[in-house]
Amino acid sequence: MNIDDYESLPTTSVGVNMTAGAIAGVLEHVVMYPLDSVKTRMQSLSPPTKNMNIVSTLRTMITREGLLRPIRGASAVVLGAGPAHSLYFAAYEMTKELTAKFTSVRNLNYVISGAVATLIHDAISSPTDVIKQRMQMYNSPYTSVVSCVRDIYKREGFKAFYRAYGTQLVMNLPYQTIHFTTYEFFQNKMNLERKYNPPVHMAAGAAAGACAAAVTTPLDVIKTLLNTQETGLTRGMIEASRKIYHMAGPLGFFRGTTARVLYSMPATAICWSTYEFFKFYLCGLDADQYKSSITGSSEPRKADYVLPRTTDEEQIDQEREAAKEKDTTATLHSAPTSVNASGAIKTVCELSTRPAGPTINLHTRHTDVKSPYERGFST
């Protein structure tokens, strides 16, 4: 399949978006999971980590708890990342297609689409985050995902899996709106034709992840505290904020910022580049049909994927059309038209068929005019 055909393919097919999103989500979390474990350990208050960077934290985990400690709990992420990211990207693309019909403001479109995608994604990923972070904690007693789920449910009930859901939404709504807006911004600047361009997808994804992660780190610290506590004594964002401030001061809200940014940059780069690749690849398998994300109905092949148009772009097109019409009108009035030319030819032809008379025949050949020599011999 030609790369130039990428944006004319059925890029909003629900099946394509869900499949590409699931693969991208699993690959992202599997590759970056060890660094995510380091981030969780640096943000944890039990035991408190002081003046520890990424390298020293990772070294301590491996030395004290074994080589496989940084990847414990990865299976929970794999189980949750697939369906969560599948619905995440499908909801984003579907909402973006729908809102484009009602607004021409691009950033508003991205914000609304990102918010809807986040609500659906977090409803699925919140329980897996709790399991993952419990297994990432220092001296965690859990050796498997199943034992972790059973123990949490037995001791704390089902609500423990959604204890930080509100905080997670408060964190992820601004995170994802910044994420999607930044990604689409760099796409519009670096990839004007919106074609399949792996370097641009990776660069835009990395920039989006870095910006979103840096801004929302304090909320991530609060979420980590709520997810990792076993007693459930700390309830809500306000109480968690007070506890963090009391134990670590103002800087406690920014613990693990470097690890979070370094995690998010490659993670989002991997996620977006993988998603765009599989969307590009899977579209090529059914390039002649376009299935709407909203209705699911098949339509003829989509001519082009066009971003929501702004008022400035529409005004420019209108001015161009008006200029073309003006030039056409001026040409018709200033130069002989094909109609006038054909009329002149018709008139000349009629003159050639009329009988000879006093009127001069413009088509009379010079041989028809007799010379004096010829007139002398005429009878």
Swiss-Prot record:
It is a multi-pass membrane protein. Belongs to the mitochondrial carrier (TC 2.A.29) family. Pfam families: Mito_carr. One of its GO terms (cellular component) is mitochondrial inner membrane. One of its GO terms (biological process) is multicellular organismal-level iron ion homeostasis. Solcar repeats lie at residues 12-98, 105-189, 196-281. Coiled coil: none annotated. It comes from Drosophila melanogaster (Fruit fly). One of its GO terms (molecular function) is ferrous iron transmembrane transporter activity. Gene3D superfamilies: Mitochondrial carrier domain. It is found in: Mitochondrion inner membrane. The chain crosses the membrane at residues 14-33, 73-92, 108-124, 164-183, 198-217, 256-275. This is Mitoferrin. Residues 357-379 are annotated as: Disordered.
